[in-house]
Amino acid sequence: MKQIMIFLTSFMLLAMTGQTALAKDVQVSGSLLGKSSQEQAKQQVLTSELITLYGSKDSAELTYQIPAGASSGNQQLVIEYEASNLLISPSSLTVVIDDEPVKTLKLDGDSKRKTVKLNLNKSQSAQGYHNVSLKFYGVMKEGVCVRQDTSGNWIKIYPDSRLTLADSSEAKGTSLDHYPYPFAQSGNTAEETAIVIPDNPSSAEIEAAVKTEGYLKTVDSSVSIAYVTESELKKIDKPTIVIGVDKHWNGKVKKLLKQAGLQAKGENLLLAERVLKAEGKQQPVLFAQAASEDALTKKISVMTDQTYTGQLSGDTLSISKLQQTEKKESDKLTLENFGAGDITIGADKTSSAHYFYPASAVLDENQSAKLSLKLKKSETIQASTAENESASQAAELKVMINGQPHSVRLDELGKEDKNGFYHVTVKVDPKLLQKNRYIDIQFVTTGLKENNPCNTTDEEKWVFIDKNSTLSYAIKGMSPSADFQEWPLPYAGNQDQTTLIVLPDTVSQSKLEELSLVTESFGNEAQHSYTVKKSSDVTANDAKGRNLIFIGGINQFSLLKEKSSDLLVPQEKNGSFDVSSFEMLNETTKQVVFTQASVWDSRYTMAVFAPSKGDGTAVTKEIISYLNSNDESATVLNETNSQQVFTNHQQLKSETNSSDAEQPTQDHSQKWMYIGVLALIMVVAAVFIWIAVRRKKRKTDTE
């Protein structure tokens, strides 16, 4: 039934627009626009790390993406390289774009770092992804049967290599087909986007804005998001998303909506992408508007859930029905999830590109993880195994996971299945998967090149890796215990009721940034795991049956203030927290964070992020960084004036040790108590027996 609903929703999304169209232009006052999107030259890195190719033949595969709406001219590919000074003619580097040779560079032993700039033609500038192959052929010595595969036969490709969209590129307009471009785009550097919300945003508007930011960052982790309220909006000088309920706009945004003729109706969510133009300047703006907060809350997932974002099209959509998909934290990733297709590497192309996927925040480091590979290999590898044992030992596939190699012997793959695939399982350290924010996978082959210069054939040794190969790991259970050692559990991950994050009624830009820090630490797939509400929108009944997070000063939450005497960290008369009982200094404490059983429902937990006093900053990057990396038990932590973070871990450890030490003493005391009682019973019994015997004897003597 759920699949049918999603299909119907997909059909409705497509039916709500006629044909694909570019965003409509809206003429505005010149004072509203800052610098134009045309002035913002964009660069796209081709590789994030140094690439080294070794002769005599080697190659590397790179990709670039032409954004939607970019000009088909004035685009340039820049390759920064340096080659060994031992190379002689006919050494070369050939650049191939989309299987078409573009340029061959002569390498003649000049070891200086060089730059080659390639102007892209119309087909190479077409919107979408394009492949770049860098093919290296290195010769170090003339002659017949001369080995060229030495350590001095190399060329380096620098991370400065890039795609440049020149300043004069004329945007053709954008549409919802390309969302989230131009607000975020994988591969771009220094992307900037603004999210505009009403001056006094409601709970629904805050949640929609933060979840939209979270989605944009899954597409481009380097994108910089700035929150702007309507009254703070002086100029639109970057791609902008406007999120809100119609009746909450009173200034520039209200005027813009009227100029563009946009108004949400009923319970629909209106999505409209427009290009604002004035005096030769232009900027793209996406309006996400609803007539009610309920409509915004229920339908914002069309912008934040990949199930729906790929179905958007046209310049205007009015979303009427949306099936809420039940998201579960995934414990299995295919190479396709990493953005890879089927991969073929071998003698002429020894390494694949790097593929990335956000690391799960709720991955269980105490349980096993594995990479299940589905492979094919060339018959020539098998032939070399039979003929040359040393060659077979060198034939190897290395899987690089976050820089750590994992070896697969290509002569020990076992038997093929009926479809000709080999199935290999590689054990992976689960801690390695959380080493960085993103999991980085690359495949490299060794031992497949022909080492005998007199034995040259056209046989190419290769390994094929199916895109359905999977990386599997365990997800942490939803432990109800209050302990920061398990952060972000139990607040993120799979749960029956979403975590309720409570903010003060007055929400500033800085408070939104604090909220963003907390939700980002939940991980990539956490959009479904939390709900945001302002303090006045939360009742005691809302707080039951779920986990809670409060961000702000205690006095900003009437619900929390009523329970101040039940909080783990006590407060002084002036309202400031007293952390002295946790071996911390009140005088140097700026922020306090603690977790405990919920004071409204002890089956669940709550966490409080607060300034030590007043209504200042409650969440910092230092606190979140500590929580993300912490593996020690702690229920209270503080950040000092010097940005150092301390916890009550040692105190908890001492209490646990004391409890363990007291237990044998108590057991010993109880043992002697039982012995004493037993001895007393025996004495009493003996006395009764003695008295009974005496009475019986007297009675006998009397007779």
UniProtKB/Swiss-Prot annotation:
Keyword Cell membrane applies: yes
Ion transport recorded as keyword: no
Keywords: Cell membrane, Membrane, Signal, Transmembrane, Transmembrane helix
Transmembrane parts of this sequence: 673-693
Secretion signal, residue range per the UniProt entry: 1-23
Domain of life: Bacteria
Membrane topology: Single-pass membrane protein
A GO biological-process term: UDP-alpha-D-glucose metabolic process
Pfam families to which the protein is assigned, alphabetical: BcsB
PANTHER family reported for this sequence: CYCLIC DI-GMP-BINDING PROTEIN (PTHR39083:SF1)
Protein name according to UniProt: Uncharacterized protein YdaN
Species this protein is from: Bacillus subtilis (strain 168)
Gene name linked to the record: ydaN
